[in-house]
Swiss-Prot record:
GO cellular component annotations of the record: Cdc73/Paf1 complex; euchromatin; nucleus
Protein name per UniProt: RNA polymerase-associated protein RTF1
Assembly, per entry: Component of the PAF1 complex which consists of at least CDC73, CTR9, LEO1, PAF1 and RTF1.
Residue ranges constituting the Plus3 domain according to the UniProt record: 238-370
Biased segments, Basic and acidic residues type: 84-107, 119-145
Subcellular location: Nucleus, Nucleoplasm
Native species: Saccharomyces cerevisiae (strain ATCC 204508 / S288c) (Baker's yeast)
Modified residues (Phosphotyrosine): Y69
Taxonomic superkingdom: Eukaryota
Gene label: RTF1
Residue numbers of Phosphoserine PTMs: S17, S71, S477
Length: 558
């Protein structure tokens, strides 16, 4: 080995530590610089991701109500655990003892409460499922981020060691040529920048996984796939009584929506619980589950607060009948009514409706109910209602006046001068018609008063006639011979014996007195006749008359 080689080795060995320190210092400085750049990039990315998340949260349908579910961990108690209508057996007995109208009203209110309870229960269950899915997705993202950062760290460390050794080798060989060494230094710096940029770029991609909106969309897609699969499984089952109860049309629904446009199409295919009378064996009201086929227009009838001419044409199997809408109950279908309807379908060889068709019809009814009211729709509702309810008093007047006021208020809020003038004039005309109607009604009070007086007079006359008829009937009954009717009640009188004896004695004494009086009268009459006869002889020549009446025969012979 020559002295030159030894000098080179010595120089290489002596400068090795310095070069290593220099290389390590340069590498650490560059790494710190690159780390600062990557951290600044990460900060910018994280800020952007937070903003993106905030923007996405505004449109996230699954984030609604999540904050409320944390405080509602405890399950809400079922308000009506017995058949979904009663609190207990005593409550059932109390409801069945009430009048039909009051019972049906309470059952309808309880059905609304149960529907809200089921919705809250479903929302809580969905909220819990969403929170669990979000937690699982977050854990998966954290684990994926940890693995990605670990891989990035290992790769970066390996490349740094390799680059440091390579730079040392190059710098040892660059002692012979300074120019080549300078060029190699520039290449090394470019290599360091490229490798550090690749490392930072890899870390940025790792950070991109934290805020990538497509990950959220993929999560939603997975959830939708799961929910769609659950819905398909749900649609495969047989329909139950609860599914039919969702399509039940009652008296309250009819009273609210019967004048709305599209009501006939909405109720077609729904189900109802119709009152068919009283059961002779139990004495309770009997109901039947029927399917509404169409709406008929016939003679108007009273629905309670208004008149309508709409009738429901219903079927149970092959049996068809037309009912007034006020015969439909707001109560839920009972199990025996549901089974009776299924037996009617089987006897008629008709197919039971599928759950898919029931769900579609339920959505159609909900769309009809949730349709917003427009000016045109409101005018049509009022026009249909006024067809058989033309009086200005009562509910119709209140409804029409309320509609006009709402239209006027909306016109004032929108500063529409044309509509303000229009609805103000209509409201004034309506109030004028109301005042005219009230005055006319006051003028009719006199006629009503006269009619009332005439009615009262006729009522009194009828009462007197009835009283006389009852008196005549009573007299006839007194004169009626009870012996002719063997089934009549025998009338008895209390008999006091000493009074009867006294009466008999009085009668005998009276008879004796009458006889004595007759005898005295006879004696007095005979006495008067004798006195008269004596007087005739004395004063009226009675002797001469008697002599003249004597028939004396003389026989004279000469």
């Amino acid at each position: 080995m020559s002295d030159l080689d030894e000098d080179l080795l010595a120089l290489a060995g002596a400068d090795e530590s310095e070069e290593e320190d220099q290389v390590l210092t340069t590498t650490s400085a560059k790494r710190a610089k690159n780390n600062d750049q990557s951290l600044s990039k990460k900060r910018r990315i994280e800020v952007g991701s937070v903003e993106d998340d905030d923007e996405e949260d505004d449109y996230n349908p699954y984030s609604v109500g999540n904050a409320d579910y944390g405080s509602e961990e405890e399950e809400e108690a079922n308000p009506f655990p017995l058949e979904g209508k009663y609190k207990d057996e005593s409550d059932r007995e109390h409801l069945e003892s009430l009048p039909e109208m009051e019972r049906e009203t309470l059952l309808f209110e309880r059905s609304q409460i149960m529907q809200k309870y089921q919705e809250r229960k479903l929302f809580r269950a969905r909220g819990r499922d969403m929170k669990e899915q979000q937690q699982r997705a977050k854990n998966d993202e954290d684990s994926r981020k940890t693995r990605a950062s670990t891989r990035s760290t290992h790769a970066t460390g390996h490349s740094d060691i390799k680059a440091s050794k390579l730079s040392q080798l190059k710098k040892q060989r660059a002692r012979k040529n300074r120019h080549y060494s300078d060029n190699e230094d520039e290449d090394d710096e470019e290599d360091y920048r490229e490798e550090d940029y690749k490392d930072d770029e890899g870390s940025e991609y790792g950070d991109d996984e934290e805020y990538n909106p497509f990950d959220r969309r993929d999560t939603y897609d997975k959830r939708e796939e799961v929910e769609w699969a659950e819905e398909e499984d749900e649609q495969d089952r047989e329909p139950e009584i609860s599914d039919f109860n969702k399509l039940r049309i009652g008296r309250s629904f009819v009273a609210k929506f019967c004048f709305y446009p599209g009501f006939e199409d909405a109720v077609k295919g729904c189900y109802g619980r119709v009152n068919v009378g009283t059961d002779k064996r139990t004495g309770k009201t009997s109901y039947r589950m029927v399917r509404i086929e169409r709406v008929f227009l016939q003679k108007p009838y009273n629905m309670g607060k208004f008149y309508t001419n709409q009738y429901f044409g219903v079927t149970q199997g092959k049996d068809r009948k037309v009912f007034q809408m006020n015969y439909f109950s707001d109560g839920l279908f009972a199990e025996d009514e549901y089974q009776r309807y299924l037996r009617a379908l089987d006897n008629s060889q008709m197919i039971k409706p599928s759950l898919h068709s029931l769900s579609n019809k339920t959505k159609e009814v909900m769309d009809f109910v949730n349709t917003p009211l427009t000016d045109k729709t409101t005018d049509e509702v009022v026009r249909h209602r006024m067809q058989f309810n033309k009086k200005l008093s009562g509910t119709n007047a209140v409804l029409e006046k309320t509609v006009l006021r709402e239209k006027l208020q909306y016109a004032k809020e929108t500063n529409n001068e044309k509509d303000i003038a229009k609805y103000s004039a209509q409201l004034r005309n309506f109030e004028k018609r109301m005042s005219v109607y009230e005055k006319h009604h006051e003028n009719d009070q006199s006629d009503i008063k006269k009619l009332g007086e005439l009615t009262s007079k006729n009522r009194k006359l009828n009462m007197s006639n009835i009283r006389n008829a009852e008196h005549v009937k009573k007299e006839d009954s007194n004169n009626f011979d009870s012996k002719s009717d063997p089934f009549s009640r025998l009338k008895t009188r209390t008999k006091v014996y000493y009074q009867e004896i006294q009466k008999e004695e009085n009668a005998k004494a009276k008879e004796i007195a009458q006889q004595e009086k007759l005898q005295e009268d006879k004696d007095a009459k005979d006495k008067r006749e004798k006195e008269l006869l004596v007087a005739q002889f004395r004063r009226l020549g009675g002797l001469e008359r008697m002599v003249g009446e004597l028939d004396i025969k003389f026989d004279l012979k000469f």
